[in-house]
């Protein structure tokens, strides 16, 4: 599936509504009331007339990898210079996209376009285990993991971030409970992406299990994730080997893009790819839901005939 067919994206400001809310009063991810005094991630249950479906995207990575700059470049079209973004505990930006979902949402009026609101979240944290909480992770639809190509330690941090996302998103059944709700559609639960653990055996490798006749349990699956290497414009100071980075991400079946918030290189592409993954999983989950409803209906008819 190519993400360009899923999204109708334009750089024209007349087609996109951008918003910045920076408030530290409430860092819980519950219901989004479209209130600037409530920094929340979660389901849109308020029939907001501005959009049809809310898609929460959590940006994770070391400090100073450029998460805030990328968010501003994507939602507002500029690169922040001389802006102090590090005192903002919860940095929230959003962008509205016309014709979102590739037919995922069925409108009562087919001539009215579906508006998807991408809400970007950036939590500034001293320790990656501090915030967001497990519930907050599970209320997120997709993740962008950042590293700075001029800072190798930020790249080495990726494995910890991936396992953190894996652990905090999965419930006891290794499923994902994150939802995005629409005014004119079914509630869609996020379906897991079939990625494998970095330590799991790859194709062609044999599993070392000589001491046990029982295979270890499979690791919890990963939600939709895109990894980005920011500051790719700074070629002279690049220390992360792009070939090694691609090999690592390929081993996880996670898309990798080298981007630049400064020059806008591949910024839109990264978000488009993530949205494509989210839409794909929503469609899979909806097909599963319809199949389950059909099975229940058949079972109900059988029970009625037996009476």
Curated annotation (Swiss-Prot):
Gene Ontology biological process: hyperosmotic response; phagocytosis; vesicle-mediated transport
Main localization category: membrane
Residues binding GTP: 61-68, 122-126, 230-233
InterPro entries recorded: P-loop_NTPase (IPR027417), Rab (IPR050227), Small_GTPase (IPR001806)
Subcellular location: Cell membrane
Region (Disordered): 1-45, 175-223
Comp. bias (Polar residues): 1-10, 186-202
Compositionally biased spans, kind Low complexity: 11-45, 175-185
Gene3D superfamilies assigned: P-loop containing nucleotide triphosphate hydrolases
Record-linked Pfam families: Ras (PF00071)
Propeptide residue span(s): 305-307
Assigned GO CC terms: plasma membrane
Keyword Membrane carried by entry: yes
Keyword tags: Cell membrane, GTP-binding, Lipoprotein, Membrane, Methylation, Nucleotide-binding, Prenylation
UniProt motif Effector region: location: 83-92
Lipid addition sites, S-geranylgeranyl cysteine: 304
Stated family: Belongs to the small GTPase superfamily. Rab family.
Protein name per Swiss-Prot or TrEMBL: Ras-related protein RabR
Organism: Dictyostelium discoideum
Gene name of this polypeptide: rabR
């Amino acid at each position: 599936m190519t993400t360009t067919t899923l999204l109708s994206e334009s750089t024209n400001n007349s087609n996109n509504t951008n918003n910045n809310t920076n408030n530290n009063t409430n860092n819980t991810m519950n219901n989004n009331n479209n209130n600037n005094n409530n920094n929340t991630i979660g389901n849109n249950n308020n029939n907001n007339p501005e959009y049809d479906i809310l898609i929460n995207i959590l940006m994770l990575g070391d400090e100073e990898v450029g998460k805030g700059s990328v968010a501003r470049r994507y939602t507002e079209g500029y690169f922040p210079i001389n802006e102090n973004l590090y005192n903002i505990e919860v940095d929230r930006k959003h962008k509205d996209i016309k014709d979102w979902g590739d037919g995922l949402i069925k409108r009562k009026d087919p001539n009215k376009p579906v508006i998807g609101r991408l809400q970007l979240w950036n939590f500034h944290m001293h320790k990656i285990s501090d915030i967001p909480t497990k519930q907050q992770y599970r209320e997120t639809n997709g993740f962008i993991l950042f590293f700075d190509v001029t800072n190798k330690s930020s790249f080495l941090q990726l494995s910890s971030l991936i396992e953190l996302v894996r652990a905090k998103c999965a419930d006891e059944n290794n499923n994902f409970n994150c939802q995005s709700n629409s005014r004119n559609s079914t509630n869609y639960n996020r379906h897991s992406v079939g990625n494998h653990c970095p330590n799991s055996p790859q194709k062609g490798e044999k599993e070392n299990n000589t001491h046990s006749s029982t295979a270890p349990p499979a690791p919890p699956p990963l939600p939709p994730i895109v990894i980005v290497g920011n500051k790719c414009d700074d070629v002279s100071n690049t220390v992360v080997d792009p070939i090694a980075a691609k090999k690592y991400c390929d081993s996880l079946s996670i898309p990798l893009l080298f981007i630049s918030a400064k020059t806008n290189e591949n910024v839109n592409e990264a978000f488009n790819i993530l949205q494509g993954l989210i839409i794909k999983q929503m469609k899979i989950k909806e097909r599963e839901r319809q199949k389950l409803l059909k099975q229940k209906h058949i079972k109900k008819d059988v029970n009625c005939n037996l009476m």
